């Protein structure tokens, strides 16, 4: 029981930490200023560093490896959010978007809790990928 409580405390701490990154990024995105591009990239890099340091996730990992490394569904949801935000802000890398789609589908298939947000994200990603293929 003590181990489970400790694991939950660590998970809660990690969730709060990464959510703070996203709050900062959201504030910058709402401002919409090009002046903040460097700061947006810095926060995205901080988020990647967080996942790299906490779970050894690297930029070259495929979907299966990411799922192996980040076993918690809440943290996987946040990683999806990070990759999608990175796509929107910077790279427009379709390969990353495909990973996001695969992660969302994995979460939909393995998490008994229905997530409207995941459903909408999945539809948005499919639309973007379809537009890029035309």
Language-model segments: which ranges?
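N-terminal alpha-helical interaction modules that lie
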Residues: 2-73, 127-134
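Amphipathic alpha-helical binding modules
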Residues: 93-134
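Charged, low-complexity interaction regions
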Residues: 31-37, 89-94, 114
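Amphipathic protein-protein interaction modules
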Residues: 64-110
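Aromatic-enriched hydrophobic runs in primary sequence
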Residues: 11, 21, 43-48, 83-87, ...
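Structural register within alpha-helical repeat arrays
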Residues: 20, 24-27, 62, 79-86, ...
């Amino acid at each position: 029981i003590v181990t489970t409580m400790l694991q939950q405390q660590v998970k809660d701490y990690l969730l709060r930490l990464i959510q703070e990154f996203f709050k900062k990024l959201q504030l910058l995105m709402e401002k919409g200023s090009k002046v903040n591009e460097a700061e947006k990239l810095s926060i995205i890099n901080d988020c990647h560093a967080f996942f790299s340091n906490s779970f050894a996730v690297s930029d070259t990992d495929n979907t299966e490896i990411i799922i192996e490394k980040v076993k918690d569904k809440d943290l996987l949801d946040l990683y999806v959010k990070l990759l999608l935000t990175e796509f929107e802000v910077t790279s427009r890398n379709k390969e990353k978007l495909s990973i996001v789609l695969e992660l969302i589908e994995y979460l939909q298939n393995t998490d008994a809790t229905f997530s409207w947000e995941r459903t909408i994200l999945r539809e948005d990603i499919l639309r973007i990928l379809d537009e890029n293929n035309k």
